[in-house]
From Swiss-Prot:
Encoding gene per record: Pcolce2
Key words of the record: Disulfide bond, Glycoprotein, Heparin-binding, Repeat, Secreted, Signal
Lineage, highest ranks first: Eukaryota, Metazoa, Chordata, Craniata, Vertebrata
Signal sequence bounds: 1-22
PROSITE patterns attached to this UniProt entry: CUB, NTR
Disulfide bonds: C32-C58, C85-C106, C153-C180, C207-C230, C296-C363, C300-C366, C311-C414
Name of this protein: Procollagen C-endopeptidase enhancer 2
Organism annotation: Mus musculus
Amino acid sequence: MGGASACIPLCLLLATARMARPQTPERPVFTCGGILTGESGFIGSEGFPGMYPPNSKCTWKITVPEGKVVVLNFRFIDLENDNLCRYDFVDVYNGHANGQRIGRFCGTFRPGSLVASGNKMTVQMISDANTAGSGFMATYSAAAPDGKGDRYCGGRLEKPSGTFKTPNWPDRDYPVGVTCVWHIIAPKNQLIELKFEKFDVERDNYCRYDYVAVFNGGEVNDAKRIGKYCGDSPPVPIVSERNELLIQFLSDLSLTADGFIGHYKFRPKKFPTTTTTPVTTTLPVTTGLKPTVALCQQKCRRMGTLESNYCSSNFVLAGTVITTVTRGGSLHATVSIISIYREGNLAIQQAGKNMSVKLTVVCRQCPLLRRGLNYIIMGQVGEDGRGKIMPNSFVKMFKNKNQKPMNALKNKQC
């Protein structure tokens, strides 16, 4: 009896200690899509941090309190990499129904903060049947429309004229990890004229790191891209095809620069207009061609010169052939890029700082590509983003002395 009495205080002490022990917070369980509300929360691909499933389409609808805007921050992203994000990707939209697309993301690049124009945002992830990764994880939060801080930018512009600029302009450099989207909307019978007054964005030959992209219409759509810009030379004035333009600015997590300030104004449609030539040219896509006896019996010789073939080609590059595989009379090659002079719709694969493309030589020995050799290659682009090399395509050995005339051609207006 005495022993039992002595146990009572000890048992109470142990029970109290167990109750006082801090509880380990539960890890969120991520499912395919859902309705998310409140001031803040988490969003992630199905099964994160495990591999996301193939052949899936997941949609999350986020709503924060009225009078606030949604701010989305990606903490981690690992999806199948593709230059055009055609296979596995995450789309982010303003609103819930038929909203403007703010951005499309894939690979492992983590974009900056994404800000909706209102209190609703839609996130959609699509995966195909092939390569997968760990997916993504992001946080969303509510912010005051006019108190989002220096890291936030973008918005809907509907006044007859106005200005847009990078965060911190002109006091200091723009910050790292920023994504800004300005959606300019004019009345139906008007167009939009765009001019950059000052421009200084981290320089790169292919504008891979920090860049400004301008699109006809109200969403990020490579088929409607007017140009992609970086460096310290302001783009030439731009005139929209219709009454909407979208401007996207993105900075990565390394170097920054002064940034830019630009102005826009509406103008009547009746004025004669010419849309500026894109920096990254989008040309008509050619259909896939199969080798035929007649086609492959053509004389195998290149036609014309560097100059005469440059503008008629969808893409122009110098590169090293790293792999070749023969399939059904055609040669499929992977080419590591030395320099690219004209990109068109060519799908460029990137691994670190190395870039490569897939090419199909329709008639496998005409023209002849050998592994380990460097070539200047001009050709067309198929619907799959591969380069198409025909018997009369311009292909020649690339030597260092070719660099100067090729750079001169790169500045040529076609």
